[in-house]
A protein has these predicted regions:
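Catalytic phosphate/metal-binding cores of nucleic-acid and nucleotide-processing enzymes, i.e., regions
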Residues: 1-164
Length: 164
């Protein structure tokens, strides 16, 4: 199978899994935009729109490859003008629920809402200032989640019910 076909299948699988979980059309594949790539997927979570980039790897990517994937995700998110970027890494022979999802901590804070994070963890003014800086710091650390954890973070329990 050609690499382009593998990518198309992966993007479609991510779209289908997210839409099934969310219970509505929260994710769609993005058409190519020439040299100004806008990512592979457009994902809507409440009032945020995220750019999704997908990568298929036969084995776990090296640190250098992973950094390149993250940089590409940031660039494509900027090109698309969206609220944050999300990197999906499919490793051969893993179920979709165990695919890795990488997002910047700033995207995580946008998804959770800065005020709800501060309230939940009872943070002081200094911690609030650090979190606010993370929202504008595009090179800040990334979080690694599983696909299942990402979907639960964004949409809670699946619309079709637990255990089905």
């Amino acid at each position: 199978m050609r690499p382009k076909d593998i990518g198309t299948r992966m993007e479609s699988k991510i779209r289908d899994v997210i839409n099934d979980w969310a219970g509505w059309k929260a994710c769609e594949r993005v058409a190519l935009h020439g040299n100004n790539d806008h990512g592979d997927l457009r994902i809507v979570v409440d009032d945020l729109v995220l750019t999704g980039e997908s990568k298929h790897c036969k084995e776990y990517p090296s640190e250098g490859m992973l950094e390149d994937f993250k940089a590409q995700t940031i660039t494509e998110n900027v090109n698309a003008g969206q609220d944050g970027g999300v990197l999906f890494v499919n490793l051969t022979n893993r179920s979709v629920q165990r695919w890795e999802v990488w997002m910047q901590k700033s995207t995580f804070l946008k998804l959770h809402g800065l005020d709800s994070v501060i309230e939940r963890y009872e943070l002081d003014d200094a911690a609030r200032a650090r979190l606010e800086q993370m929202l504008v710091d595009t090179k800040h650390d990334w979080l690694r989640l599983t696909m299942a954890a990402f979907m639960h973070l964004c949409w809670g329990s699946p619309a079709w019910g637990e255990g089905e």
